[in-house]
């Protein structure tokens, strides 16, 4: 594989040189190992592109194995994502030349909508009719009836990225959020505890409280978040 990548370097050099000759070619790395960044950064980029703030012949590559296959699929419908190592190599070769920043895709402020474009444009990612039908079927299987409203409970768990201890201050105990979940459930909302890697199950039982983290699915992680009433998450103070 390493030898194959070396063989691609001359071709990458041709592409990079072409970009210096006037072709508006740009390369971008998708922050694929973090769902928030994978969705947020790309939504900012797509809205900025729609507003005319980001222009070029843009080619993307995944910076890591996508943390959510459904989200990766939806992104592949609206941006060019190279599944081969070639675009990554082009991005590396690009950085060897002065003025490389001009040929690297960026947003105004990473994953912050500083231009308030989210208020101006609808979500740039969408589900197909077949995916919507599948999502509604899965909701019924989870016990959420048609027309019901749900709140996604997002509590960062110590099982998330245990190899990054400097982020441990962001972790919280799901048990501390149980009273809030119960209060919402008693008001008629369904509460869906989100998450992919968790240490403990939801400590309370209620017909309208669903511990999705214990039955995680890539597709429903996106579908639930896209159709929720709101999210209940942790807020951090310094």
Task: Give short role names for the model-derived ranges.
Residues 1-238:
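N-terminal targeting/anchoring "stem" of glycan-biosynthesis enzymes
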């Amino acid at each position: 594989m390493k030898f194959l990548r070396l063989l691609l370097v001359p071709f990458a050099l041709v592409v990079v040189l072409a970009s210096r000759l006037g072709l508006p070619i740009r390369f971008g790395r998708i922050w694929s190992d973090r769902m928030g960044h994978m969705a947020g950064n790309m939504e900012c980029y797509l809205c900025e592109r729609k507003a005319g703030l980001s222009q070029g012949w843009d080619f993307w590559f995944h910076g890591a194995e996508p943390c959510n296959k459904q989200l990766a699929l939806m992104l592949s419908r609206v941006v060019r994502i190279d599944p081969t190592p070639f675009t990554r190599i082009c991005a590396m070769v690009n950085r060897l030349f002065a003025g490389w920043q001009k040929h690297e895709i960026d947003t105004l402020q990473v994953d912050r909508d500083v231009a308030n474009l989210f208020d101006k444009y609808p979500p740039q990612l969408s589900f197909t009719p077949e995916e919507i039908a599948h999502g509604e079927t899965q909701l019924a299987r989870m016990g959420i009836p048609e027309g019901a409203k749900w709140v996604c409970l997002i509590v960062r768990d110590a099982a998330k990225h245990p190899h990054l201890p400097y982020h441990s201050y962001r972790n919280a105990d799901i048990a501390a959020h149980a009273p809030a979940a119960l209060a919402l459930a008693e008001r008629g909302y369904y509460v869906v505890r989100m998450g992919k890697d968790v240490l403990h199950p939801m400590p309370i039982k209620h017909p309208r409280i669903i511990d999705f983290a214990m039955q995680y699915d890539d597709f429903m992680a996106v579908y639930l978040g896209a159709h929720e009433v709101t999210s209940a998450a942790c807020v951090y103070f310094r």
